Structures are given as C-alpha cells and as structure tokens.
C-alpha cells in the first residue's frame, strides 16, 4: 500500500513540474508576442534625414519604457568646427526645459517645509521684491509663479559669456521688470522672469547658489553627471550651439538673466534618469528626490493655457488628449537649441529629444510621435487615424468704448514717459510718445484684451538697439486702460502703462 502511494506521489510531482514548465514557456512566448523588440528604424530614418537635408548638426534621442532605456543614441556632430561627434553623454542647452528642473527643486523645498506653495513669493526673496501699480502682490504666490498665473508677463534677456559684466544678478531684472501686470490667479501669461524669480527663491531659502543647490540636491542624487547650470567655456563634452539660418552658423555663447527659466545643460542619458523619476520608476544609478504625491501634484494642478486640451501644471505642459493619452511635456526652443521631454505616464513611457540648433516644433513632434508609435501600438493606431481639423479663428469686435483718445504714462526704471493712444473706427490708429511723431499702429486685435504693435524707442539703456517693435497688451477697466508694453529689441522687456480716456478727439 505504501509502495503505490509513493509511486502516485512521484507521478503527481512529475505532472505538476511538466505543467508549470509548459505554462512558464507559454507565458514567456505570450510576453514576446505582446512586447516584441521595438523597431526604431523609422525614427532613426527621420533623424538622419534632418541631418542630411536640413543640415542639423546633431540630434540625440532616448526612449524609456517601464524603467528601461529602449533607445539611446546620438547622431551628428556636437562641434562642427572640431569634428567632435555627439554622444549620449553630450550636454545640450535645454532652454525652457530648465523650468521643469527648477519646479522640481521648488517641490523638494516644499517637502522639506522650507517653502509653502501658497505663500507670497516676496516672503522668500531677501534683497528684492516683486511690485505692482494695481494688484495685491501677496497674491503672487509660489504656485502661481510655477503655473504662470502670478501676473508677471513676457521677459527675456541674455548676455555674452565673454563679456566682463556677464552674467549679471537677477536682482536688477526683478527690480526693474518684476511687475505684477495682471490680477494674480486670473490670467495665464508665460513668464521667464517668473521662473527666474523661483531660481532666486531657491537660492535665498537654501542659502546656496542656485547652481550649487541643483548640483547637490537634484543632479548628484539622481546620478545626472553631465548636467549643470549655465554655459561653461571650460566644459569639454558640451554641444556647441548653431543658429537656425541656412548655413547653421556658430552661435555665440550666451547666458540668461533668468537662470531658473532657461540655463540648464543636460544629456539624453541624464534626462532619461529625470524622466524615470517622474514616471515613478527606479532611477538608474540614482535615488528618489521628491515623493509620488509631489509628482502627481505637479501634473494635476492645472490651469488652462487657452487651447483645447492644453493646460499648464507646475513646471510641465499637459495635453489631456494627446492621441488618446495624457501627455506631460517639458520643452525648450531657441534659434540655436531644441530640447523635448515628453512622457505618457499611464503607459510608463518617455521620449527625450535634444538638438544643438533650432528645429521647427512640427519636425520634433514627428520624430517623437514615431518613437512613441514604436512602443505603443494604440498610440500608433490613434496617430494613423487622426484627422487634423482646422479650428476656426474666432474674431472679436472692438468695443465702442475703446474708440477715442487715451492719455497716460509708461513707467520705466529711468523715468515716466507720456503716451497718447488714438483709436478710431476708420482705422486712423496711432501712438504718440512724449511730444514726438505719431507712430502708426499695426496688427490691432481684440481678444479679451487689446493687442497691437508700433515701431519706436522708449530710450532706455536695456533695449540696447533702436528702433524696435513694441507690443501692447492692454486691459480696460471702465475709463482706464492698463497693461504691458514689451520692447522687442535685443531683449524682451516689459513696462507698465496706464491711461485714462479723455474727451479730446
């Protein structure tokens, strides 16, 4: 009896072993069928075509899925003059993708209870403060700086790295241009100065330079060994920047006045680690620096950017219907650099694309979409069936109350400037500065605010060149017009303007 029992047990054990082995093999085959090795040949072909036909010096790309790097490759030259090839550790200028890194640093300080996102930015600024001619500056909070609703407006200014006075402190920029133009929390206005101020907040709160804080609290813990703040003439493996002209000429080395907005350099390999953090994967060679709760908060604290399905979180642009998926994007672009980090968190996928020259957004998006299509069959299906529809341009009639003559002052850091604006239904629209010649208004539009351009000169040193286009963005409050005049000269500099309607014709 015992013999038969033992024999039965042996056979039972063998059958179970065979069954488990077969099931394991079937499962493995199933996974291979479901997740074949991605074919990135079309993605690479698109990149090579750009290098060949559009004279792009170099492009580097990385694709991450489920915490693994599926593609990481560089094409072309980091430095044409010295015939230096780009590689996955070459550091590229990130332009406004830097904002995602600055926002991450703010969230780290928030987790350490050194910053309250709902507190005024001025609470944390030591030497200079933002100001306003109309609004309560305490409403310009850290979170509103992060999502571009603080009331600040357009600002951009660089200096040449080899100039003795470069770089300059952001303090002068805040003192001269840190003006709350719009009611905080009520208007999305993309602001480089806002992120420059956040970089200053990080420095003032941590008692470290902004550069040192990023190095010690973000780059080193994440293992981002080829990431740093600001251009360096001594750094060896850095992609030279080339203008987007037909010759792709070498661009000068410049430094931003707002490093928190646009001064980080990084490589595709480093940004792959940064993406893994936000996809909540194990960071290769690094450790987690902010919690998943902070990541969710950054990606879900949304304000509308004015386009369908387009929002802005804290340091990230959000598209809630990107070919059927929610996409989280950090992006920077200038005439001499391009940087993209686009994630689809629900699928645990990210694509990074870097270049050392200006490339159109459509070209970059096509490459990124092809990469997503290689790893996400549903994305590929949605992309192929997508039919672009032209959104009709909505026109707004100018209110009759805007017609007439307006007089007031432009406030600059040097002096106040008299200004008169004349608007008529017949199209005789002019701006007069001081008692100078009338300047013809062009591109007059109305969409909640009044927009138009003139060519002139405010005679302030910061513009450096003249004449230049001045862009007006004005709001009406009863018989008052207020808002921003942006001097688009060598820099983009905003000035406060306030006018009252007169009875004059």
Predicted regions and their residues:
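Short, surface-exposed loop or secondary-structure junction motifs
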Residues: 79, 133-335, 339-340
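Short, well-ordered beta-strand elements
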Residues: 340-343, 347-357, 484
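Short, glycine/proline-biased beta-turn/loop segments that scaffold the active-site neighborhood
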Residues: 117-133, 222
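Short, gly/Ser/Thr-rich active-site loops of penicillin-recognizing serine hydrolases
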Residues: 355-420, 487-505
């Amino acid at each position: 009896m015992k013999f038969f029992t033992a024999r039965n047990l042996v056979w039972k054990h063998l059958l179970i072993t065979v069954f488990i082995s077969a099931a394991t093999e079937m499962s493995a085959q199933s996974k291979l069928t479901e997740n074949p090795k991605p074919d990135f040949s079309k993605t690479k072909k698109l990149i090579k075509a750009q290098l060949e036909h559009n004279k792009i010096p170099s492009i580097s790309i990385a694709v991450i899925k489920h915490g693994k790097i599926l593609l990481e490759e560089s094409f072309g030259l980091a430095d044409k003059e010295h015939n230096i090839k780009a590689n996955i550790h070459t550091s590229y200028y990130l332009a406004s993708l830097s904002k995602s890194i600055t926002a991450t640093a703010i969230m780290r300080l928030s987790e350490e209870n050194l910053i309250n996102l709902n507190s005024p930015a001025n609470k944390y600024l030591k030497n200079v403060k933002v100001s306003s001619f109309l609004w309560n500056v305490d409403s310009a909070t850290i979170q509103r700086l992060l999502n571009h609703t603080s009331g600040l407006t357009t600002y951009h200014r660089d200096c040449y790295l080899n100039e003795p006075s470069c770089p300059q402190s952001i303090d002068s920029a805040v003192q001269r241009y840190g003006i709350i133009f719009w009611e905080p929390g009520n208007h999305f206005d993309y602001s480089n100065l806002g992120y420059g101020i956040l970089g200053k907040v990080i420095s003032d709160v941590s008692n470290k330079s902004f550069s040192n804080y990023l190095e010690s609290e973000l780059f080193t813990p994440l293992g981002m060994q080829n990431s740093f703040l600001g251009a360096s003439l001594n750094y060896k493996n850095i992609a030279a920047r080339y203008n987007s002209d037909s010759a792709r000429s070498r661009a000068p080395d410049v430094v931003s006045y707002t490093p928190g907005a646009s001064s980080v350099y990084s490589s595709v390999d480093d940004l792959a680690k940064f993406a893994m953090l936000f996809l909540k994967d194990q960071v290769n060679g690094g450790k987690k620096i902010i919690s998943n709760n902070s990541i969710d908060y950054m990606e879900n604290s949304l304000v509308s950017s004015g386009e369908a399905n387009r929002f802005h979180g804290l340091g990230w642009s959000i598209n809630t219907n990107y070919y059927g998926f929610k996409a989280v994007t950090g992006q920077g672009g200038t005439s001499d650099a391009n940087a993209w980090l686009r994630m689809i968190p629900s699928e645990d996928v990210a694509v990074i694309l870097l270049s050392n020259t200006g490339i159109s957004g459509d070209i970059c998006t096509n490459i990124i979409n092809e990469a997503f299509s290689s790893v996400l069959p549903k994305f590929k299906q949605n992309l192929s069936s997508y039919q672009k529809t032209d959104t009709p341009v909505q026109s707004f009639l100018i209110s009759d109350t805007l017609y007439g003559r307006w007089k007031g002052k432009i406030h600059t850091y040097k002096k106040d400037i008299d200004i008169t604006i004349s608007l008529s239904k017949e199209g005789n629209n002019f701006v007069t500065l001081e008692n100078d010649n009338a300047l013809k208004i062009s591109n007059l539009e109305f969409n909640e605010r009044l927009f138009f351009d003139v060519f002139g000169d405010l005679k302030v040193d910061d513009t450096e060149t003249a004449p230049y286009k001045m862009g007006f963005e004005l709001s009406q409050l009863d018989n008052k017009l207020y808002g921003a005049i942006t001097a688009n000269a060598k820099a983009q500099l905003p000035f406060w303007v306030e006018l009252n309607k007169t009875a004059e014709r």
